[in-house]
Amino acid sequence: MAERELSVAILAAGKGTRMRSQLPKVLHKLGSLSLIERLLRTVLTLKPHRCLVVVGYEQEQVRQALREYPVEFVEQAQQLGTGHAVQQLLPVLGGFQGDLLVINGDVPLLRAETLQALVERHRQVNPEVTLLSAQVADPYGYGRVFCDAQQRVLELVEERDCTPAQRQNRRINSGVYCFHWPALAQVLPHLNRNNAQQEYYLTDAVKRVGKAIALDVADPQEIVGVNDRRQLAQAYQILQDRLKEAWMEAGVTFVDPDSSSLEETVELAPDVVIEPQTHLRGVCRIGPGTRLGPGSWIESSEIGSGCHILYSVVSHSRIGNHVWIGPYAHVRPHSQIGDHCRIGNFVETKNAQIGSHSNAAHLAYLGDAKLGSQVNIGAGTIIANYDGQQKHFTEIGDRSKTGANSVLVAPLQVGSDVTIAAGSTIPARYPLPDDCLVIARSRPVVKPGWRLGIRSSRPQEPQPMPPGSLKIYPLRLFPGQDLKQELERLARQQPLQAGFVLSAVGSLSQATLRLADQTGDHLLSERLEILALSGSLCPDGVHLHLTVADARGQTWGGHLRPGCLIYTTAEIVLADSPEYRFSRQPDPATGYLELHIQPVAGDPCWPSPPPQPQQNQQTKPEADNSRPKSLQ
């Protein structure tokens, strides 16, 4: 007897209300593919005679998404249940005499082997319908399937209609059926909506069609349906677990599988190590012994053997063997990195070809460029490839080097064995022949008296401190003493003219601080270590900031306030300058008492009158040193 033809119907007309989305449920992505695309690719491996997709809600979006697949669309104008959806096939299939596989479009994890086993079982036993069931630990929410010892279906009961005893049954209905179409076609017109949902149920057709048997799926995770975002996330986790388990069996290490992800289009060689927080997307091929991550994103790229990519992004590029990338590098599309190269921290490449044994270790932009072998790019080198209208190309020959903070304005041709001095800006199209040193920077210009011209806008100017003029006051405070009160007392008794803190260590049993942008005091009632104490001291008062750390290593800092009590000791070194006199005076700009600095001899540092403009002075024109000088 000839094998019956197989057709497939995928039910994809529903809105998916629980997804709370304008996008049809079946078009939500699970990894790189939509739910229905994943199912469709599995179904097409069965090579069905016809593949029918029932569409309804936002059907144009579904039709557009599946336009490249060999499917036929059947419209369900009103969504009146699964039975109603299959009724729409009656005029389409007509006199079809084969089997019809019916699957909901939101079951993306079915394996081809499972569907093939369902069809084969159906043809061996030859019932009117074979349904796919599963034994699960928690059947809540699913309709139950009741069978005899020969797996013949005795009854199908929806969850809401189950008695307490029936709810103990752990065999559930997956909603996947293989019907003999002529038998199904006879009962479809007789379905009714005599139920709470006022819908046509396909399960009613199963009950009416005749002999029905069940086949348990080996892995219940295959029949997980996606009805909301939570279930979408669960399905994604199952998909990831499948992929990672397969690659680990093939010799790939996932240091923390739960924190990494990849897609089916990724190809990993043995001894690849995937560090935590690393994600691979698109068509990727990774060579043996390469370590990816932690914290890296690889997209549609080919990476050779023995590479390490650390905290970096590589997109649509090709990386050679034994290449180090990162941390924090960005290899943008159309980059080609040769063998034994280094692309270091904060280096960005775009449409760049970099020859073997070349390095860009840090802080560089290499866009629209071709670098030879053994090229060294200094820190801060920028290839200025865009003129505001179009991109231009730069080529650098073998063994050439750029100094720190060099700018190469494209288009530019740099020969081999060229050294570009630090700080040079090379204009576009400037000739740089082989084996030359190029220096393209201006000579320094020194303008005496410059600070006087800006003093009025900078009211607090530091003054030179004559060597050996400081007076040093070391002191130790004892348990229970108040840190601020003792320092204020010392500033008054000495008295300190222009005091400040050189160093401070010790411990506190409690600390009182005024934190940034706060008006009240903050009390820390625990033992603390003094990390830093800084500020000024004078007879008018002290202005000190304190930083402390607790037993967990958490730090606190703010204005020193009364209530900072010594726990074991405080060892403090103060200094006083006899060359100046500090005081606290109202500042009209801030409204607070601020530091006023008065040299012992001379005018106050601030405020001071603005400088008078000098008359009849002409500036001598400077020489034009902007053009580069090449030294052959």
Curated annotation (Swiss-Prot):
This protein's UniProt keywords: Acyltransferase, Cell shape, Cell wall biogenesis/degradation, Cytoplasm, Magnesium, Metal-binding, Multifunctional enzyme, Nucleotidyltransferase, Peptidoglycan synthesis, Repeat, Transferase
UniProt-annotated stretches for the region N-acetyltransferase: 251-632
Primary subcellular site in the record, as a coarse category: cytoplasm
Note describing how the cofactor binds: Binds 1 Mg(2+) ion per subunit.
Active site location: H362 (proton acceptor)
GO molecular function per UniProt: glucosamine-1-phosphate N-acetyltransferase activity; magnesium ion binding; structural constituent of carboxysome shell; UDP-N-acetylglucosamine diphosphorylase activity
SUPFAM superfamilies: AF0104/ALDC/Ptd012-like, Nucleotide-diphospho-sugar transferases, Trimeric LpxA-like enzymes
Pfam families: Hexapep (PF00132), NTP_transf_3 (PF12804), PCC (PF03479)
Residues annotated to bind acetyl-CoA: A379, N385, Y386, A422, R441
Disordered, as annotated region: 600-632
Reaction catalysed by this enzyme: alpha-D-glucosamine 1-phosphate + acetyl-CoA = N-acetyl-alpha-D-glucosamine 1-phosphate + CoA + H(+); N-acetyl-alpha-D-glucosamine 1-phosphate + UTP + H(+) = UDP-N-acetyl-alpha-D-glucosamine + diphosphate
The EC number(s) this enzyme carries: 2.7.7.23, 2.3.1.157
Role: Catalyzes the last two sequential reactions in the de novo biosynthetic pathway for UDP-N-acetylglucosamine (UDP-GlcNAc). The C-terminal domain catalyzes the transfer of acetyl group from acetyl coenzyme A to glucosamine-1-phosphate (GlcN-1-P) to produce N-acetylglucosamine-1-phosphate (GlcNAc-1-P), which is converted into UDP-GlcNAc by the transfer of uridine 5-monophosphate (from uridine 5-triphosphate), a reaction catalyzed by the N-terminal domain.
Family: In the N-terminal section; belongs to the N-acetylglucosamine-1-phosphate uridyltransferase family. In the C-terminal section; belongs to the transferase hexapeptide repeat family.
Stored PANTHER family: BIFUNCTIONAL PROTEIN GLMU, NUCLEOTIDYL TRANSFERASE
Name listed for the protein in its UniProt record: Bifunctional protein GlmU
Organism in which the protein naturally occurs: Synechococcus sp. (strain JA-2-3B'a(2-13))
